[in-house]
């Protein structure tokens, strides 16, 4: 029995040693190249606009700042990311934008921002992929703005990433019924409608015209004015 066990161990060791060194190096190089293709999370100023890009590190996503208020994103089999250009701090401004947004799966194109005191994450969704992001929240009502009805929702995130680290906070959503990519978003209409429903914002932090992807693939190229 001892001899048989020794032979089995020897055979297993031989099989491991038989793996070509080159194949291990090739796999390592491939993983390194994949990580190089993904843009790391960052924030800052670019050509007169504030930008923010966040990713959980899953999949392949490339965010690129362009001229003035333009940016582009390409993503494949991502976990979750959100990025775009805008202002810091944000405000109740009219935001005019144009471009393309082509998600395959779950993705949103929205005016996206944060406030503090209270800590609120908000979305004014202009277009989305195969999942209505408001459907997981609590329906509150509607607001009509910029040629469409928007459905209003709230949701609570527990121990989730935020501008203040991991926290529990409320989300406000306005989701456009007639999807579009391009036009003017009158943010004050949404903020006022939310306030009438008891959904109060705090002190504005950043505000961007954002592309977000969740467990999906796609591309987006957006310009704000």
Swiss-Prot record:
Its EC number is 3.2.1.8. PROSITE patterns: GH11_1, GH11_2, GH11_3. It catalyses: Endohydrolysis of (1->4)-beta-D-xylosidic linkages in xylans. Residues 1-18 form the signal peptide. Residues 37-225 form the GH11 domain. It is an enzyme of class 3 (hydrolase). Its main location: secreted. Pathway: Glycan degradation; xylan degradation. This is Endo-1,4-beta-xylanase B. Keywords: Carbohydrate metabolism, Glycosidase, Hydrolase, Polysaccharide degradation, Secreted, Signal, Xylan degradation. It comes from the Eukaryota. It is found in: Secreted. The active site is at residues 121, 212. One of its GO terms (biological process) is xylan catabolic process. InterPro entries: ConA-like_dom_sf, GH11/12, GH11_AS_1, GH11_AS_2, GH11_dom, Glyco_hydro_11.
């Amino acid at each position: 029995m001892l001899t048989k066990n020794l032979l089995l161990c020897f055979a297993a060791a031989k099989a491991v040693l038989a793996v070509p060194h080159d194949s291990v190096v090739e796999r390592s190089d491939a993983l390194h190249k994949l990580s190089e293709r993904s843009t790391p999370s960052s924030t800052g100023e670019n050509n007169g606009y504030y930008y923010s890009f966040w990713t959980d590190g899953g999949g392949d996503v490339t965010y690129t700042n362009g001229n003035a208020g333009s940016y582009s994103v390409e993503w494949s089999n991502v976990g979750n990311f959100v990025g775009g250009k805008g202002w810091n701090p944000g405000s109740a401004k009219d935001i005019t934008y144009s471009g393309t947004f082509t998600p395959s799966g779950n993705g949103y194109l929205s005016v996206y921002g944060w406030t503090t005191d209270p800590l609120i994450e908000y979305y004014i969704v202009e277009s989305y992929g195969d999942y209505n992001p408001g459907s997981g929240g609590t329906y509150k009502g509607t607001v009509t703005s910029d040629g469409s009805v928007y459905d209003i929702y709230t949701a609570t995130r527990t121990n989730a990433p935020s501008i203040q680290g991991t926290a529990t906070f409320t989300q406000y959503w306005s989701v456009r019924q007639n999807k579009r990519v391009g036009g003017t978003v009158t943010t004050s209409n949404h903020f006022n409608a939310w306030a009438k429903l008891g959904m109060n914002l705090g002190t504005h932090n950043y505000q961007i015209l954002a592309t977000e992807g969740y467990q999906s693939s796609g591309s987006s190229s957006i310009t704000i004015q």
